[in-house]
Each structure stands twice: as structure tokens, then as C-alpha cells.
């Protein structure tokens, strides 16, 4: 990566929210923390989106608590990578898409944009499917109508944005805590064995030696580090009003943005653990192989003998509510990430409503097409989630490597460049994740062909 500096005529990242939320570096630490509380919530959404649910609950249902260790390691890795995106955004004033475009020729930048766009579409497909299925389960709305309803999220987002980015953060936070409290309640009712749960955080050799466990473990890792989150986080941390030319203020901004990120990712870690624990405590050693998708999980909760008819109905309904909340959350963040990628790579200047409508439509159209082709077959639509995870796996190195190269560049980052230990860990992570994702892609296609 060469040492070109950020050009002064570069468009601000998400310019309608950039530098709009007050941050006073002279205020108390508590006030600074509260000022930066928010961007991490939007990032945490990607770590507990509907695409993660199936993997976590299947992992628990099929292999008990063994994979809790994998969720722990994945979450710690995510914290490191997201902290790097925070430093990139605040230190340079560029988001990851702008930075990548800045250092690439236009033809190569377009290739990177296509890959990033496919990753966001793949992420968004999971949210559209999750929301449509939740609406179907709760209100018996046909899947195709439910998918079309999700397009309205764009206009809701535009309406809320008029009242400031803080309102978006508050709504996302409300949805996150709705999901969190639902699963705390569901896990409490399912009465897991505490010793077995704690033992799950200890590494077991079967994770590597057992092909079935390894496959689910790779799915958890692949679904945890989300490409769109790296683009999103590097942009939305710039919504605060720290001085763009004062390293002391930048250092404070990085500190409190990283604290915010780590707290919110810890919540996402807890939610993913709860999903796995719920799957293990209710379905391990029973009908685990039948838990193929959202419908299976919903009906399994509803008819689980341990819960009884009344509690089963409550648990399954709450599951659908949580799925809807998670899907709505992810559509907000996915749409914002799509805008960041389109602006950063292509430098397009089009109206916000049109840009967001294009981004949303790119995700909804494949779902609608599949619903029409397969005549609303839920199983086929859930299989679309498998392909979406493959796209995410392919896209990951294309954002991780530019992030690593940029944040280790002293000329670009100034005093905020990566320390040696960060470079060692992040390069190790990138290599391991890339190898695991290639393996996951091969395994996925073998599964589909068999």
C-alpha cells in the first residue's frame, strides 16, 4: 500500500450524519462515554442477525455446549477487528470503502465494490428472509408480501433520520435489548445445566477432530465476522464532533468508541451464547437433526414436551418476535452499510432516498424472485441463506486485508497505527479466517451436491 494521503476533496462518509452528535473532550469521562454510546449498537446487530441464529441453535442442538468456546474466540476476534475500524475512521476521516478506493485504480476498485455489494446483499437477504418468516409466523402474512413490506423499512429509516442519528441508535438499542431479554427468559425457562454450560467455554479437541462439529464451528466463525460491519463502523464513529485536526481529541474519541464497541459486542456474545444454550438445553440428544430452519425451530419450541402447551406457545411466539426485531435491526444497518459502500467506492452523488431504495431493492429482489420460482416454498427460501453465507465468506478477505494494510501504515494513521502485537494477531486471524472460509465454501458446495 502506498503512502498517498487522504485527498481534501473526498466526500465525507455518510455526510448527513458526519460530525453531528456532540462530543466535548473537556467533559467528564462519564459524559464522554455517553456521547460515544451508540455506534457499537449498530455494529453488534450484525453479530446477532437472523443469519447467525440457525448456526448457533443447530450447534447447541447437535453438539450440546461444546461450541461455546468457538463463540467466545469469534467474539474476541471481532472486538479486535472492530477496534481497528474505529481507529481507521477516526484517525483518517475515511471509512473503509473510501480508503480502499483511495489506494486502488478505478477498475480494481469496481471489482472490490462488486464484492462488497454482494456481501451486503447476502447479509440483507438473511434479514429480509428472517423478517418475512417472522411476519408469516406471527400474522400469517404470505412470505412474498412480508418480503415486500421490508422495502418500507427504507422510508421509515429516512423518516427517522430527519430527527437525528441518535434516534436510529435508540431504536436499534431497543430492538437489541428486546432480543436479549426474550432469550434470557427462554433460557431461564429451559433450565440448562450450569456446569455443562461453563464447561463449554473450555476448548475441546473434538472441535477439530469431529468433522460435523468443525463444520458448524466454521459456520459460527464465518457468520460472526461480517464484512458490512467493518465498512459500517468505520463510518458511523465519525458522527461525533471531535476535532478532526487534534490528535488528543482523536485519541479520546478512539478510546470511548472502542469501549462502546466492546460493550455492545459483549451483548452480542451473550445473545449468541443464549441461542446455543437454548438449542442445547431443549433439543440436544432428541430431535436435533430436524432443526433445519426458522420454521423448524418455531414449531419445535411450540411442541417441546418439557415446556408444555402454554409455555411452548409463549416461547415460540417470543422467538418470532425476537426474529422480527433482529431482522428489522439488521435491515437498518444493512441499508446504511450499502450506502457507505456505494458512496465510498463509486463516489456517487444521488439523493439519499434513491440510494437507500436501490440498496434495499438489490436485497429484496433475489428473495422475491426465489419466492416466485419456488412458489413460496419456505425450505427453498431458507436454503438461500446457505448461499448468502458463502458470499460472506468469499468477501471477507477483500475487506480484512485492506483494513490491516491501512491501519498498519504509519503515514496514513499517524500515532494511531497498529502496534506490533496487533499486527501479529490480526494477520494470524486474517490467514486463519481465510483458510477456514475457503474450507467452509468447499464443504457447503459438497453438502449441497450430496
Swiss-Prot record:
Primary location class: membrane
MF terms (GO), sorted A to Z: cadmium ion transmembrane transporter activity; manganese ion transmembrane transporter activity; metal ion binding; symporter activity
Location comes to:
Cell membrane
- Cite the entry's keywords alphabetically: Cell membrane, Ion transport, Membrane, Symport, Transmembrane, Transmembrane helix, Transport
Q: Which PANTHER family match?
A: NATURAL RESISTANCE-ASSOCIATED MACROPHAGE PROTEIN 2, SOLUTE CARRIER PROTEIN FAMILY 11 MEMBER
- Any stretches that span the bilayer, and where are they? 34-54, 61-81, 108-128, 141-161, 170-190, 212-232, 263-283, 305-325, 361-381, 383-403, 422-442
What family is this? Answer: Belongs to the NRAMP family.
Kindly state a single biological-process term from the GO annotations of this entry.
Answer: iron ion transmembrane transport
Q: What is this protein called?
A: Divalent metal cation transporter MntH
Its GO CC terms are: plasma membrane
Report how it sits in the membrane: Multi-pass membrane protein
Amino acid at each position: 500500500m502506498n503512502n498517498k494521503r487522504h485527498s481534501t476533496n473526498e466526500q465525507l462518509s455518510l455526510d448527513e450524519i458526519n460530525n453531528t452528535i456532540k462530543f466535548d473532550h473537556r467533559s467528564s469521562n462519564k459524559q464522554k462515554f455517553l456521547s460515544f454510546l451508540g455506534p457499537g449498537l449498530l455494529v453488534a446487530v450484525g453479530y446477532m442477525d437472523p443469519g447467525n441464529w440457525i448456526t448457533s441453535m443447530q450447534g447447541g442442538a447437535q453438539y450440546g455446549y461444546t461450541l461455546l468456546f468457538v463463540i467466545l474466540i469469534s467474539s474476541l476476534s471481532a472486538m479486535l477487528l472492530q477496534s481497528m475500524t474505529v481507529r481507521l475512521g477516526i484517525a483518517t476521516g475515511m471509512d473503509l470503502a473510501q480508503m480502499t478506493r483511495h489506494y486502488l485504480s478505478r477498475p480494481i476498485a469496481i471489482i472490490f465494490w462488486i464484492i462488497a455489494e454482494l456481501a451486503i446483499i447476502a447479509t440483507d437477504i438473511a434479514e429480509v428472509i428472517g423478517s418475512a418468516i417472522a411476519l408469516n409466523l406471527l400474522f400469517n402474512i404470505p412470505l412474498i408480501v412480508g418480503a415486500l413490506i421490508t422495502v418500507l423499512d427504507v422510508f421509515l429509516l429516512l423518516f427517522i433520520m430527519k430527527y437525528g442519528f441518535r434516534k436510529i441508535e435508540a431504536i436499534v438499542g431497543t430492538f437489541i435489548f428486546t432480543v436479549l431479554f426474550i432469550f434470557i427468559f427462554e433460557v431461564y425457562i429451559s433450565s440448562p445445566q450450569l456446569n455443562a454450560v461453563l464447561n463449554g467455554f473450555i476448548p475441546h479437541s473434538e472441535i477439530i477432530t469431529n468433522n460435523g462439529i468443525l463444520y458448524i464451528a466454521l459456520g459460527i466463525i464465518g457468520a460472526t465476522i461480517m464484512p458490512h460491519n467493518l465498512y459500517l463502523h468505520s463510518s458511523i464513529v465519525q458522527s461525533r464532533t471531535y476535532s478532526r485536526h487534534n490528535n488528543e481529541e482523536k485519541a479520546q474519541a478512539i478510546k470511548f468508541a472502542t469501549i462502546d464497541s466492546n460493550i455492545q459486542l459483549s451483548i452480542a456474545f451473550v445473545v449468541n451464547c443464549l441461542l446455543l444454550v437454548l438449542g442445547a438445553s431443549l433439543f440436544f440428544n432428541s430431535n436435533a437433526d430436524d432443526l433445519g430452519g426458522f420454521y423448524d425451530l418455531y414449531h419445535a419450541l411450540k411442541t417441546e414436551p418439557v415446556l408444555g402447551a402454554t409455555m411452548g406457545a409463549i416461547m415460540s411466539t417470543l422467538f418470532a418476535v425476537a426474529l422480527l426485531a433482529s431482522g428489522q435491526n439488521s435491515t437498518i444497518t444493512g441499508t446504511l452499510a450499502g450506502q457507505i459502500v456505494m458512496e465510498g467506492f463509486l463516489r456517487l452523488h444521488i439523493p439519499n432516498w434513491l440510494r437507500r431504495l436501490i440498496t434495499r431493492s438489490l436485497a429484496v429482489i433475489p428473495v422475491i424472485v426465489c419466492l416466485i420460482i419456488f412458489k413460496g416454498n419456505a425450505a427453498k427460501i431458507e436454503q438461500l441463506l446457505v448461499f448468502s453465507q458463502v458470499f460472506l465468506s468469499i468477501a471477507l478477505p477483500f475487506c480484512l486485508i485492506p483494513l490491516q494494510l491501512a491501519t498498519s501504515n504509519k503515514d496514513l494513521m499517524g500515532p494511531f497505527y497498529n502496534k506490533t502485537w496487533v499486527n501479529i494477531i490480526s494477520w494470524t486471524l486474517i490467514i486463519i479466517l481465510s483458510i477456514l472460509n475457503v474450507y467452509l465454501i468447499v464443504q457447503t458446495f459438497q453438502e449441497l451436491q450430496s
